[in-house]
């Protein structure tokens, strides 16, 4: 069983690659929330668990994280790309 962790910083357009962004600026969104990420993960077809008490190491204030369960068939970068694309569609 593979668990992937998605931090909001990985999809944040306001962050640089060195600050933790994992997708291109074309796919990134501004200030993503864990609720939006979890909804996008579920729409992509995976189970998501929100952990609100977790803090990304490079952030002062904690925004939480989303744990993706049983994503054995996708790499983390594929998963992040699909989630980011769905989040962009949600915001339009």
From Swiss-Prot:
One of its GO terms (molecular function) is 7S RNA binding. The keyword Lyase does not apply. One of its GO terms (cellular component) is signal recognition particle. GO terms for biological process: SRP-dependent cotranslational protein targeting to membrane, signal sequence recognition. It comes from the Archaea. It is found in: Cytoplasm. Belongs to the SRP19 family. Part of the signal recognition particle protein translocation system, which is composed of SRP and FtsY. Archaeal SRP consists of a 7S RNA molecule of 300 nucleotides and two protein subunits: SRP54 and SRP19. This is Signal recognition particle 19 kDa protein. It comes from Haloarcula marismortui (strain ATCC 43049 / DSM 3752 / JCM 8966 / VKM B-1809).
């Amino acid at each position: 069983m593979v668990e992937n962790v998605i931090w909001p910083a990985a999809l944040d357009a306001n962050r640089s690659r060195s600050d933790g962004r994992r997708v291109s600026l074309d796919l990134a969104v501004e200030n993503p929330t864990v609720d939006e990420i979890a909804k996008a993960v579920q729409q992509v077809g995976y189970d998501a668990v929100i952990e609100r008490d977790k803090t990304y190491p490079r952030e002062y204030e904690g925004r939480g994280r989303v744990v993706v369960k049983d994503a054995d068939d996708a790499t983390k970068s594929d998963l992040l790309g699909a989630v980011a694309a769905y989040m962009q569609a949600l915001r339009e």
